[in-house]
UniProtKB/Swiss-Prot annotation:
Location relative to the cell: Cytoplasm
Residues bound to ATP: K610
Protein name: Leucine--tRNA ligase
Motif ('KMSKS' region): 607-611
GO molecular function, one term: leucine-tRNA ligase activity
Annotated source species: Neorickettsia sennetsu (strain ATCC VR-367 / Miyayama) (Ehrlichia sennetsu)
Length: 831
């Protein structure tokens, strides 16, 4: 048989394909893998994401769908600016070079993208539209500017959204984030908190884990606000938020955030005290939940940290008893949650209990329960109210409803929901981003740029060695004229957070015209299958859901949910390698040392990361094994949602398997002149069952199971010798989504002028799948002996007995039986 010249095969097959054609008469299917940042190099982790999407796109085309499968570049961002500083290259040039390189890599692996729709977010043709969106949001009251205390990354010298602060550090730089107050633009995502939360119920095609993460981040708390008057200050009060209003009679103190307005208004803290609390206050993105602990998804352990409070000079009055309660400024009360003020009921809240113990505050139980241990708070929402005046004798839920009605009727409070979700800060102090289309005029104040003057583009000549934002220091770009009065004005020198660009790109792909074309969006949106990492659950996916709603409100599109189904692929992992000094090595470095006889420590299989150097270069793999082997292996072992361990042995096995397929087909092609082999009924039933299972697995995106079925069919055809044009076509048709180059090449040999790409999927006979017989493979010491047909209801003993006759007099040491699949006899004597 001929050698497996995959490079020649890839070149041949790619010359046949046209991925830009579409038929609007067919039912649409929109499959989209999250578009990449153009870092310049694709690794195996990228491969898995994109191949999953490509397999699905090819399969759906074969089912007759009009498939939209586009690609683009998330091209703005800080790495390009860093390259400009470190390598003295303009961000645009750096980005364009990387895009060209990655485009070549993506095309080399046979991804069936419609390249005619390719977009780049750093192109003025793209960001002109998002500048229009921003102006529409501004007009609709969805965008606003205010002085705000922000998360400042001192290394990247930019503002970070709460979601971009992880354990107090910048999500990119890892620097400890500090607080600053500067003017910032915001989008009113908080106005959509309830809608975003309820919308999750309709997303039945999303993983529950992602929906839970978004639910926690939105952080809805149902409760009430209650007014506590301030002693000595007529008609002044503190409005507290609580999810447990029924425990009001157990209140022994009130506490406010260090950022509560009263701290400044009543001069409650010295500068030193204020700084102590600012440092001690736990991350404000982890919000307070009166029931018992934090409801957030990060820093959960902080609920156990020391509760620090500074006793103020004022007291507040209990709204029912009139008792005076001490007021603290405390490190566990957050300005961004509820009203920034709480009442403390130590007997029924773990955090309040810890605070009360530290400051020797009263602890009065107002819920009677079987629990008699007063050394611990009773936090469950059940029991009978006691020591609670008019609430005594009521069940907790009944008392909660009653107290809310009471405070509403006498005008000291009302039912209220609070949300953790804060408005999205979109200003970034960097050059390589989309300019914000507003100017500032001394006479007219802030003015939006006229739509006809868009896009506001970036200046080419920029000095990147200056500290902070290069646009702020540009000698000419920021100076312009006011669109209202014509007088001198200054441009806003901030640029949009790059998540602004990625929050609508899926809609831009719907039309080749650019921007959002409503009719095209009606045709293709929502995305039917969106594929990407679970690390985007809160950031990108939540922002995109909000942005879609904002675009809907402004009349651009008709949908509110952008992604019907979501697949979060698992990470690609690899062994780590270290030299004798403990330094991490790239796989090729480790191999080189081993060849020299030097010691290499092989570590556990971990997520691929540049820091541990356990990354595998995609170009090297494709060059050595071919695109099809890389595609086939990356989907072969685990379900797409699970992590995947890369190994040289695995990719080599996939390469050899594809070579085996090539040899099998060529064996048929070389012998077909001798006449077609008639496929027996038993083999037909087996093939029919494989097609049935394969179709089911493809529909369910169980791609590793589908790969197993390809193996099963190859084994069946090899063992039975049932090689015919019909059976070979079945093999190539189900192989094509996974190894398209080889399948296309062999299909051209099978029949002239036939292109496999886009041809109909193979059908199966439902009646044959109901057969009462099953065909098993009989093996001896792992080697194929013969196929054996048995009745489905045969016992294991009967099957083994029948199979044993096929190995004659061999001495059997052990029998491995896989129901419905195989009997393997391990024999010490050949017989």
């Amino acid at each position: 048989m001929s050698n497996y010249d995959f490079k020649k095969i890839e070149q041949f097959s790619q010359s046949l394909w046209d991925f830009s054609s579409c038929d609007f008469q067919r039912k649409k299917y929109y499959v989209l893998s999250m578009f990449p940042y153009p870092s310049g190099k694709l690794h195996i982790g990228h491969l898995r994401n994109y191949v999953i999407g490509d397999v699905l796109a090819r399969y759906k085309r074969s089912q007759g769908y009009n498939v939209l499968h586009p690609i683009g570049w998330d091209a703005f961002g800080l790495p390009a600016e860093k390259a400009a500083i470190n390598s003295n290259i303009h961000p645009r040039i750096w980005t364009e070079k990387n895009i060209a390189k990655m485009r070549t890599s993506l095309k080399s692996i046979g991804l069936s993208y419609d390249w005619s729709r390719e977009l780049s977010t750093c192109s003025p043709k793209y960001y002109e539209h998002e500048q229009k969106f921003f102006l529409a949001f501004l007009k609709a009251g969805l965008a606003y500017r205010k002085n705000s205390e922000v998360n400042w990354d001192p290394i990247d010298k930019t503002v970070l959204a709460n979601e971009q602060v992880i354990d107090g550090r910048g999500w990119r730089s890892g620097a400890v984030v500090v607080k600053r107050k500067i003017p910032q633009w915001f989008l009113k995502i908080s106005d959509f908190s309830e809608e975003l939360l309820k919308g999750l119920e309709s997303l039945t095609g999303w993983p529950e884990k992602v929906k839970t993460m978004q639910t926690n981040w939105i952080g809805k708390s149902e409760g009430a606000v209650i007014k506590f008057s301030i002693s000595g200050y007529e008609e002044r009060f503190i409005e507290v938020f609580t999810t447990r209003p029924e425990t009001i009679f157990g209140a022994s103190f009130c506490a406010i955030s260090v950022n509560h307005p009263l701290v400044n208004e009543l001069n409650l803290l010295s500068n030193a005290e204020r700084e102590i609390l600012r440092i001690q206050t736990t991350c404000e993105s982890d919000h307070y939940d009166d029931n018992k602990n934090f409801s957030g998804t990060t820093n959960l352990e902080k609920v156990h940290e020391q509760k620090l409070g500074i006793l103020t000079k004022i007291k507040v009055k209990h709204p029912f008893s009139g008792d005076e309660l001490p007021l603290y400024v405390a490190n566990f009360v957050f300005a961004e949650y509820g009203s920034g003020a709480i009442f403390g009921c130590p007997a029924h809240d773990t955090r309040d209990f810890a605070f009360a113990q530290q400051y020797n505050l009263p602890c009065l139980r107002v819920i009677s329960a079987k629990c008699t241990n007063t050394a611990l708070p009773y936090c469950l929402e059940e029991g009978v109210m006691c020591n609670s005046n008019f609430l005594d004798g009521m069940q907790v839920i009944e008392a909660r409803k009653f107290i809310i009605e009471k405070i509403s009727s006498i005008g000291i409070g009302e039912a209220k929901n609070s949300y953790r979700l804060r408005d999205w800060g979109i200003s970034r102090q960097r050059y390589w981003g989309c300019p914000i289309p507003v100017v500032y005029c001394e006479k007219c104040s802030m003015q939006p740029v006229k739509v006809e003057d868009l896009p506001v583009t970036l200046p080419e000549e920029v000095e990147f060695t200056v500290q902070g934002n290069p646009l702020e220091h540009h000698p000419t770009w920021k100076y312009t004229n006011c669109p209202k009065c014509g007088g001198p004005a200054v441009r806003d020198t901030d640029t949009f957070d790059t998540f602004f660009e990625s929050s609508w790109y899926f809609a831009a792909f719907c039309s080749k015209e650019g921007g959002i074309v409503k009719e095209s969006c009606k045709r293709f949106l929502p995305v039917d299958m969106y594929i990407g990492g679970i690390e985007h659950a809160i950031l990108h996916l939540l922002y995109a859901r909000f942005f879609t709603r904002a675009l809907n409100k402004c009349g651009y599109i008709d949908i509110v949910e952008p992604f019907r189904n979501l697949l979060t692929q698992g990470m690609v992992c690899h062994e780590t390698y270290q030299n004798s000094s403990g330094e991490y090595l790239y796989p090729e470095e480790a191999k080189s040392l081993l060849e020299k006889g030097e010691k290499v420590l092989v570590g556990k299989i971990e997520k691929m990361s540049k820091s541990k150097k356990n990354v595998v270069d995609l170009e090297e793999i494709v060059s050595k094994y071919g695109a099809d082997a890389a595609r086939f292996f990356i989907l072969s072992d685990n379900p797409p949602e699970n992590s995947f361990g890369w190994s040289d042995r695995g990719i080599n096995a996939s390469f050899k398997f594809l070579q085996r397929i090539k040899n099998l087909v060529e064996r048929y092609l070389s012998s077909k002149n001798s006449g077609e082999v008639q496929t027996g009924q038993n083999v037909k039933i087996q093939i029919n069952k494989i097609i049935c299972d394969m179709t089911k697995y493809m529909d369910e995106i169980k791609l590793n199971c589908a790969v197993a079925k390809i193996h099963e069919l190859v084994n069946l055809l090899s063992a039975s010798g049932a090689l015919s044009k019909e059976t070979i076509h079945v093999l190539l048709r189900i192989l094509e989504p996974f190894a398209p180059h080889l399948a296309e090449y062999l299909a051209s040999k099978l029949e002239n002028n036939v292109i496999l790409y886009g041809s109909p999927w193979v059908a199966y006979n439902e009646v044959l799948t109901q057969s009462d017989a099953v065909t098993l493979m009989v093996r001896k010491n792992g080697k194929f002996v013969q196929l054996l047909e048995v009745k489905k209801d045969s016992s294991e003993e009967e099957i083994i007995s029948q199979a044993k006759r096929l190995i004659k007099n061999a001495v059997v040491d052990k029998v491995i039986y896989v129901p419905g699949k195989m009997v393997n006899f391990l024999c010490s004597s050949p017989g």
